[in-house]
Amino acid sequence: MFDTNSTRLPIWGIGCNPWTAEHVDQTLVSGNDIC
């Protein structure tokens, strides 16, 4: 669940909706913005 992208989670969490780590990971892979 928490891999190399785990470092991005705190950054994405700021000013964005509180998504789960798995959802954020899938979003980053998809290349879509969650904000």
From Swiss-Prot:
Keyword Nucleus in annotation: no
Give the propeptide segment as residue ranges: 1-10, 19-35
Q: Which GO terms describe its molecular function?
A: toxin activity
NCBIfam families in the record: amanitin
Where (3R,4R)-4,5-dihydroxyisoleucine occurs along the chain?
I11
Q: Which residues carry this modification: 4-hydroxyproline?
A: P18
Please, which domain of life does this record's source organism belong to? Eukaryota
> Which lineage?
Eukaryota, Fungi, Dikarya, Basidiomycota, Agaricomycotina
Report residues of the Cyclopeptide (Ile-Pro) crosslink: I11-P18
| Record's miscellaneous remark | The typical symptoms of amatoxin poisoning are gastro-intestinal distress beginning 6-12 hours after ingestion, a remission phase lasting 12-24 hours, and progressive loss of liver function culminating in death within 3-5 days. One of the few effective treatments is liver transplantation.
**Function (record text):** Major toxin belonging to the bicyclic octapeptides amatoxins that acts by binding non-competitively to RNA polymerase II and greatly slowing the elongation of transcripts from target promoters.
- Family as reported in the entry's similarity comment: Belongs to the MSDIN fungal toxin family.
Q: Which Pfam families match?
A: Amanitin
Q: Which InterPro entries does its entry note?
A: Amanitin/phalloidin (IPR027582)
User: What is the protein named?
Assistant: Alpha-amanitin proprotein 2
- Assigned keywords, A-Z: Hydroxylation, Thioether bond, Toxin
Keyword Protein transport listed? The answer is no
Annotated organism of origin:
Galerina marginata (strain CBS 339.88)
Post-translational modification remark: Processed by the macrocyclase-peptidase enzyme POPB to yield a toxic bicyclic octapeptide. POPB first removes 10 residues from the N-terminus. Conformational trapping of the remaining peptide forces the enzyme to release this intermediate rather than proceed to macrocyclization. The enzyme rebinds the remaining peptide in a different conformation and catalyzes macrocyclization of the N-terminal 8 residues.
- Where is the cross-link described as 2'-cysteinyl-6'-hydroxytryptophan sulfoxide (Trp-Cys)? W12-C16
Positions of modified residues ((3R,4S)-4-hydroxyisoleucine): I11
